[in-house]
Amino acid sequence: MPAFRYLIVLPLLCWGFASQAETTPQSRLKSFLDSARTLQADFTQVRLDESGRPRQESGGSFYLQRPGKFRWDYTKPYRQQIVSSGGKVWFYDVDLEQVTAKRLGQAVGSTPALLLSGEMALEDNFTIEDQGTEEGMYWIKLVPKSEEGGFRYVLIGLEGDKLAGMELSDNFGQLTRIYFANLRTGITLDPKLFQFSPPAGVDVFEDK
């Protein structure tokens, strides 16, 4: 398996509260996930070391269509793509000319976005906790019930009825934070966004 430079994300994604009377993190998360089927946003991703200092910043565009389809287009500092069509997740490093493919269920540790794609029973697989409000966002914490999750926890930050931020803590103690801007939901997305074929001449690795 090649060493990829992905800072994933993550992540994670969906949106919108149905009622302010729903006060548990489980009900808020469910309302958030059920209220929209598509999403498009710009994102900035910052990877932090164990002391909380920024190590690398990246950014690009994110697209999601539930269930199971998402796409991260990284444009800086390196060109990378992460594409799920609902069956496989493709990781493409443009500069290294390398592609790896994973089955959707195997990709959670690499693409936390899968958690909110509608493909997993969250309450069966994660402990869901209320983290209160900070930086103007209401935070929900997801902790894997299995040690094989590939990460310690994921935080989802909601600002009103919009996805505003995410934080991933991996098993090596590193934090990845993602901030969203120019977010739109309930829009029509081009089906081609979620299609991927490895370009000619690239190295392709596939997890069995």
UniProtKB/Swiss-Prot annotation:
Gene Ontology BP, a term: lipoprotein localization to outer membrane
Signal peptide residues on this chain, from the entry's feature table: 1-21
Family: Belongs to the LolA family.
Pfam families (alphabetical): LolA
Domain of life of the native organism: Bacteria
Origin organism lineage: Bacteria, Pseudomonadati, Pseudomonadota, Gammaproteobacteria, Methylococcales
Function recorded in the entry: Participates in the translocation of lipoproteins from the inner membrane to the outer membrane. Only forms a complex with a lipoprotein if the residue after the N-terminal Cys is not an aspartate (The Asp acts as a targeting signal to indicate that the lipoprotein should stay in the inner membrane).
Descriptive protein name: Outer-membrane lipoprotein carrier protein
Keywords, sorted A to Z: Chaperone, Periplasm, Protein transport, Signal, Transport
GO cellular component term of the entry, any: periplasmic space
Alphabetized InterPro entries for the sequence: LolA/LolB/LppX, OM_lipoprot_carrier_LolA-like, OM_lipoprot_carrier_LolA_Pbac
Chief location of this protein within or outside the cell: periplasm
The keyword Secreted belongs to this UniProt entry's keyword annotation: no
Subunit structure: Monomer.
Cell location: Periplasm
